[in-house]
């Protein structure tokens, strides 16, 4: 499991939030805005954005204080490996944008594909579906407008 230690040396087990909420809590980067994230937010319904830096986003999910972290920009393996382990052992999920488990040490440049971290795998899959559907729709729509002109 994943644990954190409070100031009084009390060890607490981390556990992701499994219950379905009416308002999805989405962790986003302060310094990496994304058009793909904006597209997801348009489709998701009621949500709350929580902005945090670096690996704290993973920790909020592992602690049950956030539901989804879509990372739709470049990262390196060393940026996410520890956070991935923390979320995984707290019961959460990290899937690449093509719905696969993240693999490490497969490329020379050590860059990750886009991914979604979530408290539940179904949330990650739903977010990925919305992101990829919206991306394909927008591409198709732009292409159709160009061809028609």
What are these regions (language model features)?
Residues 92-108:
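Acidic, metal-binding active-site segment of PIN/NYN-like and related structure-specific nucleases
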Residues 30, 73-75, 97-100:
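Short secondary-structure boundary segments
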Residues 78:
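Acidic donor-binding loop at a coil-to-helix junction in glycosyltransferase catalytic cores
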Residues 26, 60-62, 82-88:
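Hydrophobic residues within well-ordered alpha-helices
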């Amino acid at each position: 499991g994943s644990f954190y230690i409070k100031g009084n040396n009390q060890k607490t087990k981390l556990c992701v939030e499994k219950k379905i909420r009416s308002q999805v809590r989405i962790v986003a980067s302060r310094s990496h805005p994304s058009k793909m994230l904006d597209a997801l937010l348009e489709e998701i319904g009621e949500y709350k954005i929580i902005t945090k830096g670096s690996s704290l986003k993973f920790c909020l999910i592992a602690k049950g204080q956030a539901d989804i972290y879509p990372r739709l920009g470049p990262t390196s393996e060393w940026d996410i490996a520890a956070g991935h382990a923390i979320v995984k052992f707290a019961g959460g999920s990290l899937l690449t944008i093509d719905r696969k488990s993240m693999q490490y040490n497969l490329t020379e440049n050590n860059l990750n594909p886009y991914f979604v971290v979530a408290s539940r795998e179904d949330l990650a899959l739903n977010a990925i579906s919305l992101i990829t559907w919206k991306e394909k729709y927008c591409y198709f729509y732009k292409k159709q407008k160009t061809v028609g002109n």
